[in-house]
């Protein structure tokens, strides 16, 4: 497949804080990824927003850092059940991901094989580049949506346009991190931005 054949647009989506709600971890006092299936809660407006993107011809690709197993916080089986719970809720609304990409590693992990540096953890664009090659996606016509600076850096490194959800316009979030092309309050607003922009 030549570069000229890459014409399909995609929306690459972070998971926690974008599609489903973050959960308060009482041990750390921080809002984190859900550690139990019952804690998975799809954010309001997300299913119809994703359906609009899907109907407009965008491939939906989930790209998420999920280091809780590497950090010893949960089992691989639990991570799988959490994903299945989320997928089941979205399938009820006819939402289908072209690919689901989870990085299970962490630089400070405690489990062999999942600790240390890896090629796939965001901000690395590795998953986006793989999806481009496997599905013939045009990254220049695609978008990355996330709530963290690493999501925005990932998208920019891959050559997509970027939207930060839940951030203040013009604020990058961390010193030295890139500013998103757009900053909005929710996935619903992010979809309005995408569908209002011409294919470039």
Report residues per predicted region.
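Conserved Lys-Pro-Asp/Glu-containing loop-to-beta segment of HAD-superfamily phosphomonoesterases
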Residues: 119-152
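Hydrophobic "anchor" residues on beta-strands that sit immediately upstream
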Residues: 10-12, 61, 143, 182
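Structural recognition of alpha->loop->beta junctions
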Residues: 83-102, 174-195
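Metal-dependent phosphoesterase signature
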Residues: 19-43, 66-78, 92-93, 111, ...
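Substrate-recognition element of Asp-dependent hydrolases with the DxDx(T/V) motif
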Residues: 46, 50-89, 95-109, 155
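Acidic, Mg2+-coordinating phosphoryl-transfer loop and its flanking beta/alpha structural elements
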Residues: 140-185
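Short, hydrophobic alpha-helical segments
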Residues: 135-137, 191-200
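Active-site neighborhood of HAD-like aspartate-dependent phosphohydrolases
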Residues: 2-59
């Amino acid at each position: 497949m030549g570069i000229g054949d890459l014409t399909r647009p995609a929306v690459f989506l972070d998971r926690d804080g974008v599609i489903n709600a973050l959960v308060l971890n009482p041990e750390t006092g921080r809002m984190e990824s859900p550690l139990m299936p019952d804690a998975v809660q799809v954010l309001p407006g997300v299913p119809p927003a994703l359906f609009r993107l899907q109907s407009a011809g965008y491939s939906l690709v989930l790209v998420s850092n999920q280091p809780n197993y590497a950090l010893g916080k949960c089992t691989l089986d639990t991570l799988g059940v959490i994903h299945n719970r989320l997928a089941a809720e979205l399938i009820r609304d006819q939402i289908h991901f072209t690919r689901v990409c989870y990085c299970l590693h962490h630089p400070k992990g405690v489990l062999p094989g999942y600790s240390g540096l890896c090629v796939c953890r965001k901000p690395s664009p590795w998953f986006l580049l793989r999806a481009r090659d496997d599905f013939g996606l045009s990254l220049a016509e695609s978008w990355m949506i996330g709530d963290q600076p690493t999501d925005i850096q990932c998208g920019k490194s891959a050559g997509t346009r970027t939207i930060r959800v839940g951030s203040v316009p013009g604020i990058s979030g961390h010193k030295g991190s890139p500013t998103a092309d757009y900053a909005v309050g929710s996935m619903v607003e992010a979809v309005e931005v995408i569908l209002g922009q011409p294919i470039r």
